[in-house]
Amino acid sequence: MKVKSKMNDNEKNNRIISEYNDLKNKINLWNKAYFDYDEPLVEDSIYDATLLKLIKFENQYKFLDNSDSPTKNIGAKVSKKFSKVQHQFPMLSLNKAYKFDDLKIFERHINKLGFFPNYFLELKIDGLSISLKYDNGNLIQALTRGDGISGEDVTENVFQIQDIPKQIKYSKPIEIRGEIYLSKSTFYEINECQKSQNLTIFANPRNAASGSLRQLDSSIVKERKLNSFFYSVTNPLDHKIKNFNDQELFLKENNFQVPSLNKFVDTIEKAYEFIKDFEKNNYREKLNYEIDGIVVKVDDFSLYDILGQTSKFPRSMIAFKFSDISIETKLIDIFISVGRTGKITYNAILEPVIINGTLVSAATLHNYEYVESLKLNKNDNVKIIKAGEIIPKVVSLSKKNSETIFKRIEYCTSCNEKLVQPEDEVDQYCINKKCLMIRLRKIEHFASKKAMNILGLGFQNIEKFFKLGILTKYSDLFFLEKYKNLIESQPSFGEKSFNNLIESINRSKSNSLEKFIFAIGIKQIGERSAKLIANEVKLLSNLINFDFEKLNNIRDISCKTINSLKCFFSDENEIEEIKIILELGLDFKNLENEFESKKLQGLNFVITGTLSKPRDFFKELIIKNGGNVLNSISNRINYLLTGEKSGSKIEKAQKINTIKILDENEFNKLI
C-alpha cells in the first residue's frame, strides 16, 4: 500500500508540475505578444485570472521551481523594443482593498506605530504608469514601470504627448510620476479608425494607451492624442514638499495635469464614506477617462519612511477597488443545479476572470425568466459583477454570438421528473422526494459550516457514502462510526480522516436548536428565522407538535414561513428523521445567551498556527465560554493561542505588552 501511495503522489506531483508549466508558458506567450508586437491576445481580466491561478499554485505547492515565474515581477517584462533602464527608486504597485475591513487593517498598522494621520484621496487612473526625470528644468528621460525595477525608455514618444511639460520652472533634478491614458472619446475615435482600415481594435483604453506609447514610429504616438495625470514627486521632502497640498501646488505651478476630484479626510471612516458616495452617485461614468478605484494615501510625507514598504507595496497608501466593476467574459455553458428544496437554479460557466481580487469562473443566472430576459445562450459575451461579498452575477448581454435563447428546462436533470412552477413564484421546482440530488443536497446542507458544521464531509464523500448505502439521510451521519472498516478502505479516506470526521460529528451533538432547525433544510427558513423559531420552541422535542400559529406574533416570521413549517412537519419522513435524532438522546435546546461557563467572558483571542484540532473547534470553545475570536493582532487582544508554524502574529503580539501568548496546554488550563 505504501508503494502505491508513493506512486500516486508522484503522479499527482507530475500533473501539478505540468499544469504549472502550462500556466507559465501561457503567460509568457501573452507577454511576448503584448510587449513585443503590441497585440494583446486576451482581456486583462483573463490575464489576471491566469496569473492569480499561478500564484495559488506557488503558494500551495512549495516544490515547484518558480525561479522564472512571472510572479517574481511587479509588472510586465520589459519590452525589447526600447532600451532597458533601471529605476533610481523602484516603482511599486499598490496593495488593494475591496471592503471597509481592508481599509481598517491598513489603518491599524499605522495606528499601532502610534500615528493617526489625515488621508488624501485621489482617483486611480486606469492607464500606463510613467516616471519623468527633469534636470535644469528640462525633461531628460521618461520610463515606463516595466517590472518595477527597470522600465522602458520611451522618452522620444513622451515628447509627442501634448499635455506633458517638456520644460518646467523648477531647476533642481527631480522625478515626477503619473499615468498616461487615453480618454474615452479618443479611444472610440481610434477604434472607429481601426475598423475602417480593417485593423484589430483595442480591447480597452488602457491597452490602447500602452500600445500607442510603444509605437516605433513616434508620429503615430502624436496622432493618438494621449493624455496624462501626475500625482507623485519622488523624495518630496528633498524638495520641501511636506504633504499633498504642497505637492498639488507644485505640480500645477509647473504645468502638470492633476486629477480634479481629490479629497482630504481625517479618518478612514470618512474615506470610506467618500468612496461609497462616489460609487452611489455614479461619478465614474461621468468622467471622460477610465478609473478603477480610489487611492487612500497618508497625507504626511514625513511618515513614509517610518511606515516602510513590502517588496511590492508601500504601507503608506492603498488602492480601494470599486465593488461594482463589471467585467466582460464569454458564457461557455449553462448548467442546471437542483437544491435541497428542489429549487432549480440556472448557472453560467464562464471564461475565468478576476473580479474584486477573486477568480470567477461561474455565476448565477437565477431562474429561466432571468435567462430569457437577458436573451442568453452559450457562447454569448456577458458582463458580470461581484458587488461586495455576494455571489457573482451575470448582469447583461454585451455581445450576442448565438442565434437563439437557451431553452427552458422542463424536466429535472437529476431524476427526470416533470418540474413545477408555483403561480406566485419565478422559480421551478422538482417535487420528487426521492430525487437523488435533493437527497444529497439535504445532507450536504445539514453538514455545512453554517448548519451543523461537520468537517471532512464534502459533497464527493456524501455521494460516495450514499452509493455505499451508509448515508442516505442526515440521521445516518450519527451511525457512521459503525462503518469504520468500510470507510477507511475507501481511496483517500484513511484512519486519520475517519477519526476527524467522527470527532466532528460528535462535536455537532452539542450544537444549538437554531443550528439544527436551519440544518434540516425547511423551505423559507434561513439562519435568522431558525433563531427566532428556536427562541419560541426551546427544545427539539417540542418542535414536532408545536403550534406554529403562535409564531404569527413574531414580526419577522411571515405567513409564508409558517405555512412552510406546517408543510414540512406534515411529512412523515421528516418527522421520522427527527424521532431518530431524539432517540439518540439529542434533544437540541435553545442556547440563547447561554455559555458553558463565563470563564472567558469579555476576553478577546486570536488563534494562529497548526493546533491538534481544527481551528473552528477552538473558536467555538472560546465563544461558548463567553470569549470573542478576532482575526488580527491589536491592543484589543487579551490572548494569542499559538500552534506550530505560528508565523508573524507572535512577533506582533510580543510588541504589545498586554497580550499573553498561550500554547494549547496553557489554553486548556484557562478553560
From Swiss-Prot:
Protein family per UniProt: Belongs to the NAD-dependent DNA ligase family. LigA subfamily.
Cofactor(s) essential for the protein: Mg(2+); Mn(2+)
Annotated S-S bridges: none
Keyword Plastid appears in the UniProt entry: no
EC number: 6.5.1.2
Record field: catalytic activity: NAD(+) + (deoxyribonucleotide)n-3'-hydroxyl + 5'-phospho-(deoxyribonucleotide)m = (deoxyribonucleotide)n+m + AMP + beta-nicotinamide D-nucleotide
Keyword Manganese: yes
GO molecular function: DNA ligase (NAD+) activity; metal ion binding
Chain sites annotated for binding Zn(2+): C412, C415, C430, C435
The protein's name: DNA ligase
